[in-house]
Amino acid sequence: MKATLCTWLPAAARKQKGFDYMNKKNAVLSPLAGGKLGKVKEIWSRNSLYSTLFALVVMVLIQAVVQGLNNGSFFGMFGGLGRAWMNILRNNVYAGIIALGMCFIIISGGIDLSVGSMLCALGGALMYLLDEKAGPLAAIGITGAPAYAISVVVIILMGCLMGALNGGLIAYGKLPPFIATLGTMKIFRSVTQQMTKTFNPEVPAGFKQIASFKIGGQVILPIIYWILIVALMYVIFKKTAFGRQTIAIGSNEKAAKLSGINVPAVKLKIYALGGIMTAIGAIIYISRIGSMDFANAGSGYEMDAIAAVVVGGTSMAGGKGNVFGAFIGMLIIGVMNNILNTIGVPTFLCEAVKGLIIIFAVLLQKKDSN
């Protein structure tokens, strides 16, 4: 059995069960451990966060060279660097917040393909609640800040329930995560499109200030929200029993169950947390943009989130990952998009590059499961 499967157990228990991961005699080496590829994989596996940071630095250097060759602004003007990074951060806030929830899901050994469609559905529901002409809150005389607060709470609860639906299908319905979330992805998108055929709400100007208010001439509130949520999710992952249980389930679900963890309940909470993160992304999206194309909004966010999590060092096999790594991974994806757009690469080829990055990252982290 892999030495790292039970690292969440006390040291004495690991030694008793023969899982002492500090004992090299018990270590299981991959058949591909030899050679240059094996060395790269070993370095990536043991220092995934440092590897991710190094990859970000390399991407930034490439970005600097590309933009410098393109218009000279990156090296010649400090403002060029600032503008480029502000755009990268702003453009990736929504998928970046979703990636934080996706990180927990993938560490637990699951996946959620429905988050893009979920964001679209939640965005539509939020716009309906906020509409001061035909919305339900305006109909009963609730407008302004009270309406904003109620709408935000309702959308977060809806996101929690939608995520819990995925978790329930997986944990209690025993459906594979891929199948369950593929089904809900189609359901969420289809229902939203059907319900918004004659939908033309207006987002109040006051609500737009939640994410569009300028500080120093720049729209940075969404970035601040993102960083604060990263810090919160990091604390939840590193300092709470819930975070340890997530790792335990992803490492070895049977062992986690035998140790007393209520696996179905924890899985339900994990997917509910993913739904909450998607709801927050939808709230910031509507506040920042003020409108939504219900046919395409959120499309591809699931792939961006998965790519960020995997590039950030989280194992697709579960049991290993880092919330901060998911944040860095999303920055890498954002810088890559900026580079490709700068050199004029078509959008469909950009998506192909993302796919190659996911495959390469998984190949680097892949190990023998025996």
What are these regions (language model features)?
Residues 7, 12, 16-97, 135-148:
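Membrane-interfacial amphipathic/re-entrant helices at transmembrane-helix boundaries
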Residues 52-65, 102-103, 156-159, 185-190, ...:
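Hydrophobic core segments of alpha-helical transmembrane domains in multi-pass membrane transport
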Residues 63-67, 81-133, 169-174, 313-323, ...:
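Single transmembrane alpha-helix segments in multi-pass membrane proteins
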Residues 69-90, 192-193, 199, 217, ...:
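Inter-helical junctions in multi-pass inner-membrane proteins, predominant
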Residues 134-184, 328-329:
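Alpha-helical transmembrane segments within multi-pass membrane transporters and channels
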Residues 148-153, 162-166, 218-293:
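Helix-loop-helix "hairpin" substructures at the membrane interface of multi-pass membrane proteins
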Residues 173, 177-239, 266-269, 288-299:
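Transmembrane helix-bundle core of multi-pass membrane transporters
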Residues 278, 289, 293-355:
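Transmembrane alpha-helical segments in multi-pass inner-membrane proteins
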